[in-house]
Regions:
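N-terminal leader/linker segments that initiate helical-solenoid repeat arrays
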Residues: 27-50, 61, 241, 250
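Short helix-capping/linker turns of helical repeat alpha-solenoids
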Residues: 42, 56-59, 72-74, 79, ...
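N-terminal secretory signal peptides that target proteins for export/translocation
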Residues: 1-11
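Terminal, low-structured helical/coil segments at or just beyond the last alpha-helical repeat
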Residues: 204-250
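Bacterial N-terminal signal peptides
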Residues: 14-24
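Hydrophobic face of amphipathic alpha-helices that form TPR/SEL1-like repeat modules
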Residues: 31-38, 53-54, 65-72, 76, ...
Length: 250
């Protein structure tokens, strides 16, 4: 696989506390919060005790949370099939995290037969709800032509949407596409900028790619990139535009 990567397995299953509290059903919000408090304290058995009844009663956030517990083997025996079952119940109710997680399970054949087309279907549903992780994952499927027709334009489109939300792997993937001129004109200034955003948040592959490009840029070009980068971050990654053509654009 090229540097255009999906995020590491564990990142999909990190709990986003604010989102989970907002999505919790009003009638079960207090119990959901108790489960979340127990989870954060490392008392996974107590989290199961609070979340499982909610999940069985149809709470989509609790269903997704039970899927996470089964996926990671926290408070319950690790069981991908059970994780898949809970994610599917959550996703079918329109829960964005459940949809993204279900896409992941289909993509990697976890608890279910691998099916890229179904992975794309569920990633698309989550992506359409604005989930940056799912947007990047859908972009990767388009990039590689897995479950969808290979389309660099669609890959770039979804990477851009994900990048606008600060999704660091999307930043890395945009860097790759600018470096290699895939769908967009090759532009090492833009590639350097996007790699730098990802590298500054800990992606070593992005750091290596950035540093390699850096050896080919002049001092003035590096200053230009710094200005572009500040503007991009100041716009919360939503309007980063294209850089002027560098000596290495064509």
């Amino acid at each position: 696989m090229t540097i255009a990567e999906r995020c590491h397995t564990t990142m999909r299953f990190l709990f986003i506390i604010s989102v989970m509290l907002v999505l919790a059903a009003p009638l079960g919000a207090q119990d959901f919060a108790k489960g979340l408090q127990a989870f954060e304290a490392g008392d996974f058995a107590a989290a199961v005790k609070e979340w499982k009844p909610l999940a069985e009663s149809g709470d989509s956030s609790a269903q997704n949370s039970m899927g996470n517990l089964y996926y990671n083997g926290q408070g319950v025996p690790q069981n991908n099939a059970e994780a898949f079952r809970w994610y599917r119940l959550s996703a079918q109710q329109g829960n964005v995290d459940g949809q993204g997680n279900l896409g992941w399970m289909f993509e990697y054949g976890l608890g279910v037969a691998q099916d890229f087309s179904r992975a794309a279907k569920w990633y698309k549903r989550a992506a359409d709800q604005g989930d940056g992780w799912a947007q990047n994952s859908l972009g990767v499927l388009y990039y590689h032509g897995q479950g969808v027709q290979k389309d660099f334009g669609q890959a770039f489109h979804w990477y851009k949407l994900a990048a606008a939300q600060g999704q660091l792997y999307a930043h890395q993937n945009l860097g790759w596409m600018y470096e290699h001129g895939e769908f967009v004109d090759r532009n090492l200034l833009m590639a350097f900028m996007w790699y730098d955003h990802a590298a500054n948040r800990g992606l070593t592959d992005a750091a290596e790619a950035r540093d390699s490009i850096g050896t080919r840029l002049s001092y003035l070009e590096k200053l230009q990139v710094m200005g572009m980068s500040k503007l991009c971050m100041g716009n919360a990654y939503k309007d980063c535009g294209d850089a002027p053509r560098s000596r290495y654009s064509y």
